[in-house]
């Protein structure tokens, strides 16, 4: 069935998904914070700031008015950076239709509270609306989806009916959506993989090889799984699209912003220099801090995350961090 969908956030991923949904025949309004971006997308059918070179579907509408975006919608897709979710969705509450399903595609952990995105929603939404929350995540570079390259992701919701409805709304012949009931696991996979991707980028920037990257991906997956289990997630989720799938993509793909940040750090640039030149958000930078503090709070051993925190926030050298990881006390593999 055709949905009336409000897409909140016009970065590369929000714009791509809005375009996909419009092409599928849904009635879609894309909300952007920047009035000038709304005007450009209306006039030129292109988001030159975040998704240059992609012609947007003629059915797609644009606004920077939250009330207009939400009017009469049956589904909401929120794709703002994770550190902005609380503010944007709190501002949205007066306009949010009570019957609308909410789909979260933000990947991160709130720095100030250590809350996952679904925990933020749980705090601000009425209980009945939180019951129809879903998380959409998986290995999906926006540009590849915009170019209709085959992609598979996961929609997680505690309600099977909600997961099915999201699955049906988003699935096309090039974008396949699988269902899952493990919202916590799907969210954590999407958040923690960004930190490991920065680590993989640092390894590449230092000139290390495929062995090193494979070790980081594998042990990063173990850390992600440990944290997830401590928070009530299912271990099997991390072997799926939202865990291993997204981790491999983000640690190896040339379109990965987080890996790019890491490569530049490995080559000797400072984090402040790198972030000062970026238009788009590299979620892994903030998530490094929140994941480090969350692991300490829960008593979960996450040595890669710990070394990443010391590199990004305490000026530890990358080579020193690598040496510490390689000379830790010897252990059985396991998780």
From Swiss-Prot:
A Gene Ontology term for the protein's cellular component: cytosol
Binding sites annotated in the UniProt record for NADPH: 12-13, 107, 142, 257, 281, 283
Single GO BP term: glycerol-3-phosphate catabolic process
GO MF, one annotated term: NAD binding
Record's keyword terms, sorted: Cytoplasm, Lipid biosynthesis, Lipid metabolism, NAD, NADP, Nucleotide-binding, Oxidoreductase, Phospholipid biosynthesis, Phospholipid metabolism
Pfam families assigned to the protein according to its UniProt record, in alphabetical order: NAD_Gly3P_dh_C, NAD_Gly3P_dh_N
Subcellular location: Cytoplasm
EC number: 1.1.1.94
Major site of localization recorded for this protein: cytoplasm
Binding site for sn-glycerol 3-phosphate: 107, 138, 140, 193, 246, 256-258
List of catalytic residues: 193
Pathway given in the UniProt record: Membrane lipid metabolism; glycerophospholipid metabolism
Keyword Membrane in record: no
Entries under InterPro entries matching the protein: 6-PGluconate_DH-like_C_sf, 6PGD_dom2, G3P_DH_NAD-dep, G3P_DH_NAD-dep_C, G3P_DH_NAD-dep_N, NAD(P)-bd_dom_sf
Reactions catalysed according to its record: sn-glycerol 3-phosphate + NAD(+) = dihydroxyacetone phosphate + NADH + H(+); sn-glycerol 3-phosphate + NADP(+) = dihydroxyacetone phosphate + NADPH + H(+)
HAMAP family: NAD_Glyc3P_dehydrog
Function: Catalyzes the reduction of the glycolytic intermediate dihydroxyacetone phosphate (DHAP) to sn-glycerol 3-phosphate (G3P), the key precursor for phospholipid synthesis.
Family the entry assigns: Belongs to the NAD-dependent glycerol-3-phosphate dehydrogenase family.
Protein name: Glycerol-3-phosphate dehydrogenase [NAD(P)+]
Annotated organism of origin: Citrifermentans bemidjiense (strain ATCC BAA-1014 / DSM 16622 / JCM 12645 / Bem)
Species classification: Bacteria, Pseudomonadati, Thermodesulfobacteriota, Desulfuromonadia, Geobacterales
């Amino acid at each position: 069935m055709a949905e009336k969908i409000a897409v909140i956030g016009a970065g590369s991923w929000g714009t791509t998904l809005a375009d996909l949904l419009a092409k599928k025949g849904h009635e879609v309004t894309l909300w952007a914070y920047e009035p000038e971006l709304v005007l450009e997308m209306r006039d030129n059918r292109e988001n030159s700031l975040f998704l240059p070179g992609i012609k947007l579907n003629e059915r797609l509408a644009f606004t920077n008015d939250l009330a207009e975006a939400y009017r009469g919608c049956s589904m909401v897709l929120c794709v703002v950076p994770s550190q902005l979710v609380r503010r944007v969705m709190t501002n949205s509450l007066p306009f949010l239709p009570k019957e609308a399903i909410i789909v979260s595609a933000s990947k991160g952990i709130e720095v100030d509270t250590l809350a996952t995105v679904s925990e933020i929603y749980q705090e601000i939404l009425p209980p009945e609306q939180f019951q129809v929350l879903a998380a959409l995540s998986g290995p999906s570079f926006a540009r590849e989806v915009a170019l209709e390259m085959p992609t598979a992701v996961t929609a997680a919701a505690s309600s099977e009916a909600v997961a099915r409805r999201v699955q049906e709304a988003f699935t096309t012949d090039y974008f396949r959506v699988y269902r899952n009931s493990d919202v916590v696991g799907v969210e954590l996979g999407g958040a923690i993989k960004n930190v490991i991707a920065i680590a993989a980028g640092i390894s590449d920037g230092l000139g290390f090889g495929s062995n090193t990257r494979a070790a980081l991906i594998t042990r990063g997956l173990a850390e992600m799984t440990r944290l997830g289990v401590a928070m009530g997630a299912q271990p099997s989720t991390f072997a799926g699209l939202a865990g291993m799938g997204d981790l491999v993509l983000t640690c190896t793909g040339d379109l990965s912003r987080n890996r790019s940040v890491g490569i530049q750090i490995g080559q000797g640039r400072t984090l402040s220099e790198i972030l000062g030149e970026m238009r788009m958000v590299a979620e892994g930078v903030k998530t490094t801090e929140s994941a480090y503090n969350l692991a300490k709070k829960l008593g979960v051993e996450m040595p890669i995350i710990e070394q990443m925190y010391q590199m990004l926030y305490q000026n530890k050298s990358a080579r020193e961090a690598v040496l510490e990881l390689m000379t830790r006390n010897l252990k059985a593999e396991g998780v």
